[in-house]
Amino acid sequence: KVFFKMLIHKSNIEGKLRKEKGKNLEYINEIKKKYDEWIEKINLLEKNLDEDAVKKKVEDLIEYKDFIDQPKFIKYQLDNNGWTAQSKLHSTVLEEFMYHLLKVIPSLNNGQFNLGPIKAYSNLFFAPKNLNSFIKDPGLTVNEKDQDFAISKEIIVKIGSEEKKINIPVISIENKTYLDKTMLDGSIATASKIKS
């Protein structure tokens, strides 16, 4: 399940391969072929941690992203073929790329940290049912925010008899292919909560 979350773009493609028909099935097969070529290039550079390898991975990402961002793969109002932003075909490329780019860092590869999408800890508060229950059940509540990709550490917080698992991000990344003012403000607020 964890590995599946890291290969979120591949999973998106495979889901579409199972359900699409007609022209979209033809399109998603084209994309799958190009995806496999892209991953093969990344895998050839897997052991390389130098700047040139990172640049090459980014160049390969741009080439693949340009391919799937062709107008024929994007659904417009009067067209039945292609995919909208809601299908996440285009946005999941960046999420998966973060995993491929960072998984080779030795200090992240020892099982001490998690890589991938998470519900990140943003804050906690206490909301007991009443004053009397506060002694036994302080009503520990943890707020979390979905993050597209993070390097995180799971920790357990125990207060009284309550115990909660929380994910503390060391690095948290929100991948956006389009960002309006409302989304920007939301991202800034989330970043502020996670950092504090």
Where are these predicted regions, by residue range?
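Short, conserved, surface-exposed binding loops centered on an aromatic residue
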Residues: 140-142, 162-165, 193-195
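Glycine-rich, often proline-containing surface loops adjacent to acidic residues and nearby aromatics
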Residues: 76-81, 166-174
